[in-house]
C-alpha cells in the first residue's frame, strides 16, 4: 500500500468514524456546541487506532492506546470548553466498539444451541468473544487511565 492510498484510507476511516460519534453524542444529549468536537475526537481515536494497526500492533493494544489518546485529549478539551470530559470521550470511543466480533460470537452461540456442539463453532465463539471482551476492556481502561494520571493530587514520586 502506497502513501497516497494509505492517506486516502485513513481519511475515509476518520470521516466514517466521525458520523457515529456525532450520532451517539446526539443520543446522549451532548450540547450542540460540542458535537463537532465529538466528531473530531471520534475521528482522531479511530484514525490513531488504524495507524497503530497498520504499523503492526494488534487490535486490542491499538484500541487501548487510541482510547488513552481520546481520554487525554478529552480532558484537555474539557478544561478549554468548561465541560465534563465524558461529554467528548464517551461518544468518541463508540465507533471503536467491537460489533463484528461480538455479533460473530453471538451467532456462533446460537448455532451451537441449534445444531449442537462442534469444535469449529466453539473455536469461533471463544475467539470472537475473547477478542470483543479484550477490546471493551481496553476501551474502558484506556479511557480511565488519563483521568487517574492527570487528576492525581499526590506527587507521583
From Swiss-Prot:
It is a multi-pass membrane protein. Its main location: membrane. The chain crosses the membrane at residues 8-28, 50-70, 87-107, 129-149. It is found in: Cell inner membrane. This is Probable succinate transporter subunit YjjB. Keywords: Cell inner membrane, Cell membrane, Membrane, Transmembrane, Transmembrane helix, Transport. The transporter is composed of YjjB and YjjP. Belongs to the ThrE exporter (TC 2.A.79) family. It comes from Escherichia coli O1:K1 / APEC. It comes from the Bacteria. Signal peptide: none annotated. One of its GO terms (cellular component) is plasma membrane. InterPro entries: ThrE_2, ThrE_Dicarb/AminoAcid_Exp, YjjB. GO terms for biological process: succinate transport. The keyword Acetylation does not apply. Involved in succinate export with YjjP. Both proteins are required for export. Pfam families: ThrE_2.
Amino acid at each position: 500500500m502506497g502513501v497516497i492510498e494509505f492517506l486516502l484510507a485513513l481519511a475515509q476511516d476518520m470521516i466514517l468514524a466521525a458520523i457515529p460519534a456525532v450520532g451517539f453524542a446526539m443520543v446522549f444529549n451532548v450540547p450542540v456546541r460540542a458535537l463537532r468536537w465529538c466528531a473530531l475526537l471520534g475521528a482522531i481515536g479511530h484514525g490513531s487506532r488504524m495507524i497503530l494497526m497498520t504499523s503492526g500492533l494488534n487490535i486490542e493494544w491499538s484500541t487501548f492506546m487510541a482510547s488513552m489518546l481520546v481520554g487525554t485529549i478529552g480532558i484537555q478539551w474539557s478544561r478549554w470548553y468548561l465541560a465534563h470530559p465524558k461529554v467528548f470521550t464517551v461518544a468518541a470511543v463508540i465507533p471503536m466498539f467491537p460489533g463484528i466480533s461480538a455479533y460473530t460470537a453471538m451467532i456462533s452461540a446460537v448455532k451451537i444451541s441449534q445444531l449442537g456442539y462442534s469444535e469449529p463453532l466453539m473455536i469461533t465463539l471463544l475467539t470472537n468473544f475473547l477478542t470483543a471482551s479484550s477490546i471493551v476492556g481496553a476501551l474502558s481502561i484506556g479511557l480511565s487511565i488519563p483521568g487517574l494520571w492527570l487528576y492525581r493530587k499526590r506527587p507521583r514520586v
